[in-house]
């Protein structure tokens, strides 16, 4: 009983300590934005043809997440290291959905210790959508609010190359070698099992086959601007308990 009382008192003191901080300082949209944490989710180990690095997804997610944190004042909590993928998408090195959720759970628990009770996960890897149902089953859903914003595009195709170019991770000099005949993961054109099992993947592959793959800086800027603005809106909704 005494131990429980001490824990309760420590929690009260922690809250008071946070309240003593200058929560209105700096460029923020609202002092309550300090209760919101931004987490980047992507993938670290996937081939992306010749133009983009193997950790493209997490770098794009981190870029968006950090910019949202800077523009709103929300806290950037870092990256989820594991990622997952559909069984029929045979490329990259991934983890189980449960391992991804366990890492998110760790970040949430640590975030709660610094006064965060609302979390926005910005995901830039399609395979990670497998965690959606598991997230809903987390036991602390009554204590916190957690939202996932999925921002994905055709794998290693024009949109992703263009975004990668804008943030500085694409090597444009390698575009001529960026060929799906040599690198089947590009637009998943050569991933037969994935195309057979997922009509959306197959449709995206067909579009890339028809239109070709290039780098468009204007397109990259537009995609990034829209993604950041959409995530800022999510932060504003969290501020309004929506």
From Swiss-Prot:
Which EC number(s) are documented for this chain? 3.5.1.102
Q: Which pathway does it take part in?
A: Cofactor biosynthesis; coenzyme F420 biosynthesis; Cofactor biosynthesis; riboflavin biosynthesis
Note whether Iron occurs among the keywords.
yes
Q: Name the Pfam families on file.
A: Creatininase
Can you tell me which residues bind Fe cation 1? 46, 57, 125
Repressor among keywords: no
Q: Which cofactor does it need?
A: Fe(2+); Zn(2+)
Give the keywords, sorted.
Answer: Hydrolase, Iron, Metal-binding, Zinc
Its assembly, as annotated, is: Homodimer.
- Which PANTHER family does this chain map to? 2-AMINO-5-FORMYLAMINO-6-RIBOSYLAMINOPYRIMIDIN-4(3H)-ONE 5'-MONOPHOSPHATE DEFORMYLASE, 3-DEHYDRO-SCYLLO-INOSOSE HYDROLASE
Official protein name in the record: 2-amino-5-formylamino-6-ribosylaminopyrimidin-4(3H)-one 5'-monophosphate deformylase
Gene label:
arfB
């Amino acid at each position: 009983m005494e131990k429980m009382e001490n824990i309760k008192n420590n929690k009260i003191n922690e809250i008071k300590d946070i309240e003593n901080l200058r929560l209105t300082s700096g460029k923020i949209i609202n002092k309550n934005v300090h209760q919101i944490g931004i987490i980047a989710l992507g993938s670290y180990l996937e081939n992306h043809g010749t133009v983009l690095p193997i950790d493209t997804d997490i770098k794009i997610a981190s870029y968006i997440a950090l910019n949202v944190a800077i523009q709103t004042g929300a806290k950037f909590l870092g990256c989820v290291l594991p990622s997952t993928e559909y069984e029929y998408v045979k490329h990259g090195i991934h983890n189980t959905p449960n391992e991804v959720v366990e890492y998110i759970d760790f970040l949430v628990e640590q975030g709660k210790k610094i006064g965060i009770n609302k979390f926005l996960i910005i995901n830039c890897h399609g395979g990670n959508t497998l965690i959606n149902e598991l997230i809903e089953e987390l036991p602390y859903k009554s204590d916190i609010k957690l939202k996932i914003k999925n921002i994905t595009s055709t794998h290693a195709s024009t949109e992703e190359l263009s975004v990668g170019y804008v943030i500085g991770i694409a090597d444009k000099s390698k575009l001529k070698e960026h060929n799906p005949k040599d690198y089947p993961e590009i637009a998943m054109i050569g991933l037969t099992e994935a195309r057979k099992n997922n009509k959306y993947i197959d449709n995206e592959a067909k579009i890339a086959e028809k239109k070709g793959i290039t780098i468009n800086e204007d397109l990259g800027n537009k995609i990034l601007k829209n993604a950041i603005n959409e995530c800022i809106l999510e932060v504003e909704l969290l501020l309004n308990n929506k």
